[in-house]
Amino acid sequence: MKKIFFGLLLVCIFLVFFLFIKKENNVIYNKIVQKSGDTVLIDETYTHLFKDGNLKELVFIKSDFKLSKSEHEKNMNATGYLPDAYRAMRPGYKFDFIFHDNKILGFKSVIFEGFEDAQVSRHENSIPSEKWQKLKDYNIGDPNVNEKFFHLKFPFVVKNTLSVTISKRFFKKIKKLKRLKIILISNEDREYKIDIENFLLKYNL
């Protein structure tokens, strides 16, 4: 029994050390650190919950990974495809906008107020590393990827996720704002407007 007790205690300590969750009102902040060999994976997630309308959640995700000191220095100082991809992809930033509806949605435009002239790309949501290197401001994915399903209506709630990948350059710009004001425009020309406190500074993301 003692061995089982101490085993469970160690598991609890491990989880507390690697998992941090902070919740206040309609906001959830979550940080997870995982280690695999010499690689450390770090995910920080900020979730803003909306009470009204079809837009239910705004989720901001910062993803990073750290190699061993020697491998890190090698990639930071070397040239070529892999070192360039390593530098371009660390850290990674993205917004996930989650909608509930009785149909599949597509979004043709995402506008950050104050940056209406931002350069927007529309690659597939799973961006290969070579496209990461060319990412200008942000990527909203292919708005017509599920076009053949747009006319269908379902007798249940469909969870739609719009993923917007942010470049490091654009992240530095929006981090300076006092408030995040974002307009999402669906393929049916319906607008979803967001106006919230800029959490990027508050949580040091």
Swiss-Prot record:
Chief location category: membrane
Domain of life: Bacteria
Cysteines engaged in disulfide bonds, as pairs: none
Keywords: Cell outer membrane, Membrane, Plasmid, Signal, Virulence
InterPro entries: BptA
Gene Ontology CC terms, in alphabetical order: cell outer membrane
Location in the cell: Cell outer membrane
UniProt keyword ATP-binding present: no
Signal peptide: 1-23
Free-text function comment from the UniProt entry: Virulence-associated protein essential for survival of the bacterium within the tick host and therefore within the natural life cycle of the Lyme disease spirochete.
Family: Belongs to the BptA family.
Protein's recorded name: Protein BptA
Organism: Borrelia garinii subsp. bavariensis (strain ATCC BAA-2496 / DSM 23469 / PBi)
